[in-house]
Amino acid sequence: MASIILINFSETDTLHLGSVNDHIMPRIGYTILSIIMALSSTFGIILNMVVIIVTVRYKQLRQPLNYALVNLAVADLGCPVFGGLLTAVTNAMGYFSLGRVGCVLEGFAVAFFGIAGLCSVAVIAVDRYMVVCRPLGAVMFQTKHALAGVVFSWVWSFIWNTPPLFGWGSYQLEGVMTSCAPNWYRRDPVNVSYILCYFMLCFALPFATIIFSYMHLLHTLWQVAKLQVADSGSTAKVEVQVARMVVIMVMAFLLTWLPYAAFALTVIIDSNIYINPVIGTIPAYLAKSSTVFNPIIYIFMNRQFRDYALPCLLCGKNPWAAKEGRDSDTNTLTTTVSKNTSVSPL
């Protein structure tokens, strides 16, 4: 039978060595997953490295409001380096070959970088809310505020991903049993209490923060857009461009993470649910693919990052370079605009 009860994963599953799990999925399925993860990890590493390198290299990008973006790129780099590449290898082998310790370390690393990335998106949303929606936000937002957001994302992720290392919760194989994650399936009170706290504070809270911040941001941008005629259109144009980029960035992140969060919540609520392990693997792989989308959005929707990153990727060429007004537009994006709201590069 193709379906299994997810809660039946045991500690010995993570020690299973030397044979392909073809009772879960045919060998060709593992090969396909290995190729997908190898490609996703490679692109994720390259693109996030470009974001980090161009930010470090060019002073124009080293602004407080860009710190959270670079922090997200670091988190998105950690996921494929410490998780994606390993998953590609284990899928190529058809079973998890790293033993119990390897499972714990891989599960911790992916969860640590993944939640740090999710918190970084929440921090980005709060940053934008402060600058766009709050009076004098750009004046008040300083380096110390940006650094506080960066530190918070890592500390928060560390706090909530280390308890399984000490007995409150655990890391266990998931899906087709070639990668590890927090153990959503064990039903004892200690593990359930951890998973509920983890879900509320590492998924629900960042999601709520993102939604609250961007709903207010979009409302403010809509109000500013109505002043386009009176304000020659320049401010409203920049505001709309910024809104489009941040909304697409957040939606891409949520669309990749929400299925995983919903899957985990379903398992927590209904302990007897039957789910095909292949279907159970899809949300996890969607979540891991988010590390590719964010740098693409930075490069192709943010003129500042695009002007510096594309030449780095394309050997000095930038086919999207603006023919006219490049300097004036860049200067507009690197300074605050209008009396009502302020925008910085995203």
Swiss-Prot record:
Spell out the disulfide connections. Answer: C103-C180
After translation, the protein is modified as follows: Phosphorylated on some or all of the serine and threonine residues present in the C-terminal region.
Keywords assigned: Chromophore, Disulfide bond, G-protein coupled receptor, Glycoprotein, Lipoprotein, Membrane, Palmitate, Phosphoprotein, Photoreceptor protein, Receptor, Retinal protein, Sensory transduction, Transducer, Transmembrane, Transmembrane helix
Q: What is its main location?
A: membrane
Instruction: State the CDD domains in the record.
Output: 7tmA_Parapinopsin
Q: Tell me a GO cellular component.
A: membrane
The region called Disordered is annotated at: 325-346
Q: Where in the cell is it found?
A: Membrane
Checking SUPFAM superfamilies in the record gives: Family A G protein-coupled receptor-like
The annotated regions of Low complexity compositional bias extend over 330-346
What is known about the tissue distribution of this protein?
Answer: Parapineal organ.
What Pfam families is this protein classified in? 7tm_1
Glyco sites are at: N8, N191
Extracellular compartment ranges equal 1-29, 92-106, 170-193, 269-276
MF terms from GO for this chain are: G protein-coupled receptor activity; photoreceptor activity
Membrane-topology descriptor = Multi-pass membrane protein
N6-(retinylidene)lysine modification sites are K288
Q: Which residues cross the membrane?
A: 30-54, 67-91, 107-126, 146-169, 194-221, 245-268, 277-301
User: What residue ranges lie in the Cytoplasmic compartment?
Assistant: 55-66, 127-145, 222-244, 302-346
* InterPro entries, per the entry: GPCR_opsins, GPCR_Rhodpsn, GPCR_Rhodpsn_7TM, Opsin, Retinal_BS
Report the protein name in the record: Parapinopsin
The species this protein belongs to is: Ictalurus punctatus (Channel catfish)
